[in-house]
C-alpha cells in the first residue's frame, strides 16, 4: 500500500458513499468493489456473516450495516475512499453524517423492488447536502427483477431526472451482463470467469439492438443539450465521440441535473467493474465541489472558505468516532484544506481546545494503513484526539475556522436501564460515555424522580443494538425497562407580566431577586426551540445578572409543568425587575428565572407533545382493510394509498406510543405478507384523554 499512500493529484480521488434501502445489497456491492480493487482476497458474503465492511459483531449477526467504516481502495490509478452507510431507518444519523463529508454517492436499488421507502428517505437526505449520484440497479439475477420498472420508480417516486447509460443483457437467472450505451458494446460475464474478474466486450445481441438504439438516442439527446457545440454537431448528424459523451454526462452528474443509471448483480459478480469506471468517469473529485464554507470561531456572520489545496491552512471535519480494540478512540476526519503531519498540534475550533494528532491512518474496513501526513481532499482515521466529537472542526491554530456542522435529531424513544451490581454501575457509565461519543443521536439523562439512567435513541432497533453493545463490548450486566416515548411539553398562549420575587432573609447576607417576564409560543427558523430577549432598561437589573435569569429559565425548561417532560418552543422576554445592593447575586437571579418560568408556563395553557411517525405499510390487497382499520385504531391518520408493483401501499401518520409491538400484530393480521417502515415525522399535540393518562402516570396518581 505504501507506494500508493496518498495521491497528491486530487483529480484522481473520489470520496463516495454507497447508499441504499436496507436489503438492496449495499454491503455486498461494497465487498465486490474491495475485491476487484485488489484489497480483499476472499469475498465476504453477508449471508455467511463474513463481510469485511460490517465489523461489529451485531452487524454480522443481523446482516445489516450500522457503523460507516471508511475504506480506501484503488482502481486504475485512481483512489476511491468509500464510506459505507447503513440503510436502516434507525440509523439515519449515520447516513446524514456520511453524506456531509462525501463528494458523490452510488445509490443502490433492488432490481425487483425499485425505489423503496427507505431509499426514498436516504435520497432526500442526499438532496439536502446536494450530493451528486449515480444509480446502480442491483440484484438483476433475482426472480422478478425488472430494470425498466426500477428506472420508472426513480422517475415517479424520486422525481429524479435519470439517464440509463446501460441496459441489461438477459434477466433473472439468465442475466449475463450489460449493454454499454456510451460505447455501444455489450459487456458479458461468462460462467467460467473466476468470480467475475474478467468480462468480454462483444457486439450487442441482435434481439437487444432496437432497445439499445432507443435508449442510446435518449442518452444522446440529454448529452447534446448540455453544450451548444455538441447540440450543433448532433443535429448536424455527426457522431459524438466517447470522450464528448462522457464529458457531458460528467457535467450533468456533478451539477445534479441528472443521474446516470447502471445495472448488475453484485452477488453474482456481474457489472461491478463498469460501475467502478462510472464512479471515476462521472462522480466529482474534491476539486469539482464548491470550497468548504465556515465561519470565524465565535463570529457566525464572518464567513470564510477553504479550497481543497495543500497550500491553504489546515482544516478538517470530524464525522465519526469509533472505539478500536487496541487504539482506544478513533476519530474519522475529512480534510478539507491544507496538510498536517502526525504528531502535530491543531485546535478544535468548535470547542476552542488544543488537540495533538497521534497516529494517522487510511482505513480498510478495520485494518489500518499508517500514513505520515494528512492532506486536503482525503479521509483519515486519527488516534489521540481527546475532546473531539462528531461534527467538530479541527484547524490550524493560526488560521481558525468552524466548518458547517451537521444537525442531529432528538431521540424519539427511551428505555430505563439499571445496572445489577456496583461494578456494573461503573462499567455502565464508561460504556455510556463511549457510545455517546460515537453516536450523537444517543442521548442519556438521569431521571430525577426514579434515579434511573434513561437512554434515548432513534428507534427500537437502535436501542436494542446500543444495549447489546453495552453487554458485549463493555460487559455490563443490566436490567432494561420497556421502551418509553420521549414526550415534550409546550405552551399554547402568551402570558404577560408574570412576576416572581425570590427572597430569603436569614441573619447575615440574604438573597433577593425580582423578575417580570412575558412568555409566548415560539418556533425559530432553523428549528430553534427557545429564545431569550432582554428588555430591561435603566439598570433595573444589573447587566451581569441577566444571563443568570436566562440560565435559570433554561434549567426550568428541562422539567415541564404538566408531567415533567422537557419544555420546548418558548420565548422569554425579560421586562423588568429589582435587585438589592447586598443580597442580590447570580444565584438569586438564576432561582428567580427558574421559578418565574414555571409560574408563567403553568398559566400559558401547557400541553403535551408526542412524536408522530410517518408509517408506510406495503400489503397485498386482500389485507388492505385490516391494515387500515388497525392503523385507525392506533390513532393513525391515513395520508395516502397507492398501488406499487401489485401490492397496496398505505401511508399514515401514527403516534409512536401506539406503534410498539406493531411488527408482530402486522404479521399476524396479514400472515406475514405485509411489511412496514417508519420514520420520525414531527411532534404534535396529544388529545386530551391521552394527555390525562400521561399526566396521571407521570405524577403517580
UniProtKB/Swiss-Prot annotation:
Xref: Gene3D superfamilies: 3.30.230.10, 3.30.70.240, Elongation Factor G (Translational Gtpase), domain 3, P-loop containing nucleotide triphosphate hydrolases, Translation factors
The UniProt entry lists the main location of this chain as cytoplasm
A biological process (GO) of this protein is:
ribosome disassembly
Keyword terms, alphabetized: Cytoplasm, Elongation factor, GTP-binding, Nucleotide-binding, Protein biosynthesis
Q: List the disulfide bonds.
A: none
Could you state a single Gene Ontology molecular function term?
GTPase activity
Q: Which SMART domains match?
A: EFG_C (SM00838), EFG_IV (SM00889)
**InterPro entries the UniProt entry points to:** EFG_II, EFG_III, EFG_III/V, EFG_IV, EFG_V, EFG_V-like, EFTu-like_2, G_TR_CS
Q: What superkingdom does the record give?
A: Bacteria
Q: Which SUPFAM superfamilies match?
A: EF-G C-terminal domain-like, P-loop containing nucleoside triphosphate hydrolases, Ribosomal protein S5 domain 2-like, Translation proteins
Record-annotated residues binding GTP? 20-27, 84-88, 138-141
The tr-type G domain covers: 11-287
The cellular location(s) given in this protein's UniProt record come to: Cytoplasm
One GO cellular component term: cytoplasm
> What is the protein's known function?
Catalyzes the GTP-dependent ribosomal translocation step during translation elongation. During this step, the ribosome changes from the pre-translocational (PRE) to the post-translocational (POST) state as the newly formed A-site-bound peptidyl-tRNA and P-site-bound deacylated tRNA move to the P and E sites, respectively. Catalyzes the coordinated movement of the two tRNA molecules, the mRNA and conformational changes in the ribosome.
Regarding protein family, the annotation reads:
Belongs to the TRAFAC class translation factor GTPase superfamily. Classic translation factor GTPase family. EF-G/EF-2 subfamily.
| Xref: NCBIfam families | EF-G, PRK12740.1-5, small_GTP
Record protein name field: Elongation factor G
Native species of this protein?
Mycolicibacterium paratuberculosis (strain ATCC BAA-968 / K-10) (Mycobacterium paratuberculosis)
